[in-house]
Amino acid sequence: MTTYSNKGPKPERGRFLHFHSVTFWVGNAKQAASFYCNKMGFEPLAYKGLETGSREVVSHVIKQGKIVFVLCSALNPWNKEMGDHLVKHGDGVKDIAFEVEDCEHIVQKARERGAKIVREPWVEEDKFGKVKFAVLQTYGDTTHTLVEKINYTGRFLPGFEAPTYKDTLLPKLPSCNLEIIDHIVGNQPDQEMESASEWYLKNLQFHRFWSVDDTQVHTEYSSLRSIVVANYEESIKMPINEPAPGRKKSQIQEYVDYNGGAGVQHIALRTEDIITTIRHLRERGMEFLAVPSSYYRLLRENLKTSKIQVKENMDVLEELKILVDYDEKGYLLQIFTKPMQDRPTLFLEVIQRHNHQGFGAGNFNSLFKAFEEEQALRGNLTDLETNGVRSGM
């Protein structure tokens, strides 16, 4: 595990502020938005569809804290781009938007360095003000939209209106208090992690923040490598994973197979009270990865000789299956959902940090074993040569 302190020179212009929103392309945006609201505690924020004059794509925008998800579906049968994307990837993340300053400068620099500009900068406006956008291509079929608000005061973005329907169930459910996006993880095919992470360093002037390799993260069967890149202010963190060769198919390779290539593996959502958050998410019916009791026995033993004092009750953490990782400075608490759709691709993480800026490397081996148990149930913990997603099936 390596932490990098050299951020490189501070960019003169074109600051990346924070994650703006995450856009999902799904088969049924209305149902997907309802699922995230009912199960994860989001609330409807905005809408764009036939009723607002959007004739091709419907978008349901949901929000919790500062976390914004946009669920999009095609309205017409001839939308080949979205149709092909769904056949290949299934429901999942299409775009990760960053709020920025000086969008034009960022695009100009990215273009000079060889980045693919999917859409050149353009401006949209309504009665609440103007917003400038641009779209860049990153790994797989994933894109990054740059969002520069020009005195914009609307609820989301131009073209969106208030939700058309108020779900009377949502106020009766326990609040989950998820606050911000902590990080977003991208999975790559083997040998593509370096080039994917280098894209951010070269084109967006991000820097390496953290890394781990397969000598540190492995089980009897499988392993991974990971590099985390971040913007200068480190308000945006993007781990990039790849599978490493092992005896069996790793959960990273399983993702790549079912996603049809690289894509967003999981989104980590931060809370300041993970115990209450997870209690309420479980009450709402969310499913999480199981953790064996042996993990907590070993954790209790190791913490006896650690300088770190975990404030939370260990019995409660064990009851809720929340993981703990720590170093000499602090600790973090984390838990992972099961996949959010039928394909074993995208899932979510809930994380709470106590003076700890890592990514749970101490839990990677335990997590891999938990993932492998789920893989085995799906029939996917197999020799690499004998199993895969077969075309035409």
Curated annotation (Swiss-Prot):
<dbReference type="InterPro" id="IPR037523">
    <property type="entry name" value="VOC"/>
</dbReference>
<comment type="function">
    <text>Catalyzes the conversion of 4-hydroxyphenylpyruvic acid to homogentisic acid, one of the steps in tyrosine catabolism.</text>
</comment>
<dbReference type="InterPro" id="IPR041736">
    <property type="entry name" value="4OHPhenylPyrv_dOase_N"/>
</dbReference>
<dbReference type="GO" id="GO:0005783">
    <property type="term" value="C:endoplasmic reticulum"/>
</dbReference>
<dbReference type="GO" id="GO:0005506">
    <property type="term" value="F:iron ion binding"/>
</dbReference>
<keyword id="KW-0585">Phenylalanine catabolism</keyword>
<dbReference type="InterPro" id="IPR005956">
    <property type="entry name" value="4OHPhenylPyrv_dOase"/>
</dbReference>
<keyword id="KW-0560">Oxidoreductase</keyword>
<feature type="modified residue" description="Phosphoserine">
    <location>
        <position position="211"/>
    </location>
</feature>
<dbReference type="GO" id="GO:0003868">
    <property type="term" value="F:4-hydroxyphenylpyruvate dioxygenase activity"/>
</dbReference>
<dbReference type="GO" id="GO:0000139">
    <property type="term" value="C:Golgi membrane"/>
</dbReference>
<keyword id="KW-0223">Dioxygenase</keyword>
<keyword id="KW-0408">Iron</keyword>
<feature type="domain" description="VOC 2">
    <location>
        <begin position="180"/>
        <end position="338"/>
    </location>
</feature>
<keyword id="KW-0333">Golgi apparatus</keyword>
<feature type="binding site">
    <location>
        <position position="183"/>
    </location>
    <ligand>
        <name>Fe cation</name>
    </ligand>
</feature>
<feature type="binding site">
    <location>
        <position position="349"/>
    </location>
    <ligand>
        <name>Fe cation</name>
    </ligand>
</feature>
<feature type="domain" description="VOC 1">
    <location>
        <begin position="18"/>
        <end position="149"/>
    </location>
</feature>
<dbReference type="Pfam" id="PF00903">
    <property type="entry name" value="Glyoxalase"/>
</dbReference>
<comment type="similarity">
    <text>Belongs to the 4HPPD family.</text>
</comment>
<feature type="modified residue" description="Phosphoserine">
    <location>
        <position position="226"/>
    </location>
</feature>
<dbReference type="InterPro" id="IPR004360">
    <property type="entry name" value="Glyas_Fos-R_dOase_dom"/>
</dbReference>
<protein>
    <recommendedName>
        <fullName>4-hydroxyphenylpyruvate dioxygenase</fullName>
        <ecNumber>1.13.11.27</ecNumber>
    </recommendedName>
</protein>
<dbReference type="InterPro" id="IPR041735">
    <property type="entry name" value="4OHPhenylPyrv_dOase_C"/>
</dbReference>
<dbReference type="GO" id="GO:0005794">
    <property type="term" value="C:Golgi apparatus"/>
</dbReference>
<feature type="modified residue" description="N-acetylthreonine">
    <location>
        <position position="2"/>
    </location>
</feature>
<dbReference type="InterPro" id="IPR029068">
    <property type="entry name" value="Glyas_Bleomycin-R_OHBP_Dase"/>
</dbReference>
<keyword id="KW-0677">Repeat</keyword>
<keyword id="KW-0256">Endoplasmic reticulum</keyword>
<keyword id="KW-0472">Membrane</keyword>
<dbReference type="GO" id="GO:0006559">
    <property type="term" value="P:L-phenylalanine catabolic process"/>
</dbReference>
<feature type="modified residue" description="N6-succinyllysine">
    <location>
        <position position="132"/>
    </location>
</feature>
<keyword id="KW-0963">Cytoplasm</keyword>
<dbReference type="GO" id="GO:0006572">
    <property type="term" value="P:tyrosine catabolic process"/>
</dbReference>
<keyword id="KW-0597">Phosphoprotein</keyword>
<dbReference type="GO" id="GO:0042803">
    <property type="term" value="F:protein homodimerization activity"/>
</dbReference>
<keyword id="KW-0479">Metal-binding</keyword>
<comment type="pathway">
    <text>Amino-acid degradation; L-phenylalanine degradation; acetoacetate and fumarate from L-phenylalanine: step 3/6.</text>
</comment>
<comment type="subunit">
    <text>Homodimer.</text>
</comment>
<keyword id="KW-0007">Acetylation</keyword>
<keyword id="KW-0828">Tyrosine catabolism</keyword>
<dbReference type="GO" id="GO:0005789">
    <property type="term" value="C:endoplasmic reticulum membrane"/>
</dbReference>
